[in-house]
Every structure is written in C-alpha cells, then in structure tokens.
A protein has these predicted regions:
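Detector for glycine-centered tight turns/loop "hinges" at secondary-structure junctions
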Residues: 76, 113-114
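Short cysteine/histidine-rich metal-coordination sites, predominantly Zn2+-binding motifs
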Residues: 99-106, 115-124
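N-terminal pre-ligand scaffold of iron-sulfur
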Residues: 15-18, 22-25, 29-96, 122-139
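N-terminal secretory signal peptides
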Residues: 1-8, 23
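Short, flexible active-site loop motifs that bind/organize anionic cofactors or intermediates
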Residues: 3-4, 43, 103
Length: 139
C-alpha cells in the first residue's frame, strides 16, 4: 500500500534542510554586542571610558577598520592591542583566561600581548594608549 500524501518528497526535504542551514548561518552572524567604531582618531582622542574596561576582560573597539582590544593592567592602567592574531589573522577575543584566538588556540597575556601558548610565535601588535583622567586615550 502506497501513501501518496503522507510522505515528503526528496525536494521538500532538501529545501527544508537548506532553509534550516541558512537560518543557522545567519544566526551566527548576529546577536553579538555592538562594537563601537572610531574613524580618523588621532592622539589624544578618547577610545573608551576607563570604567568601561573590565578588570578581567577586554573592551573591544573598531579603530579605522581594525579591531582593538583594550585591557586593564592595573586599577588605573591599561594596554591595547590589535586584535588580529599574528598566526593567521583571526580575531583574538577576551576569554576568562585572558586573550585567545578562537581559530587555532593561541593565547596571549592581556598585560603584555606576549604569546602564552602557540601556534602563534609573535605577540599581539600594541596600540599606543594611556589613561588620562577617567578616559583611555590614544597616545
């Protein structure tokens, strides 16, 4: 006995599967926190309020098209790094353990940018910043 209307066609299954994969891909593109973007910033320009830089993480900002991580090295001191991993160019992120590349697992010291664990062999490129009053500014 053949049930004509109770079966899905191969085409219906493929279309539904493709739509599901497309929705999953789009979900991965969104939902993240908005990263502030600065263009044409110069020495002395405010990057972020010091209070917005978490003591155990990093503040992310896009500076002239490149992602920058600002980390706290002491209560009133910070460091900043280009977030591009020197290994293969993935974007380094703040984690519970410091700064890490999600692509290949390189880990970096938030205070110095030095490599803690490879495969990266070079430190993160520093971005010159300083604390001025209650703000982190480009220097």
């Amino acid at each position: 006995v053949r049930l004509e209307h109770d079966c899905l066609s191969r085409r219906a299954v493929l279309l539904a599967g493709g739509a599901g994969l497309g929705a999953l891909g789009l979900a991965g593109c969104g939902g993240g926190a908005d990263v502030p973007e600065l263009t044409g910033a110069a020495a002395g320009d405010v990057l972020v309020a010091l209070a917005d830089v978490p003591p155990d993480g990093a503040y992310e900002v896009t500076l002239d098209g490149r992602r920058v991580l600002v980390t706290r090295t002491a209560e009133d001191a910070v460091a900043a790094y280009d977030a591009e991993c020197p290994h293969q160019g993935c974007t380094v992120r703040a984690t519970a353990d410091g700064l890490a590349c999600p692509c290949h697992g390189s880990a970096f010291d938030p205070a110095t940018g030095e490599v803690l664990e490879g495969p990266a062999t070079s430190p993160l490129a520093p971005v010159a910043v300083e604390v001025r009053g209650d703000d982190v500014v480009l220097s």
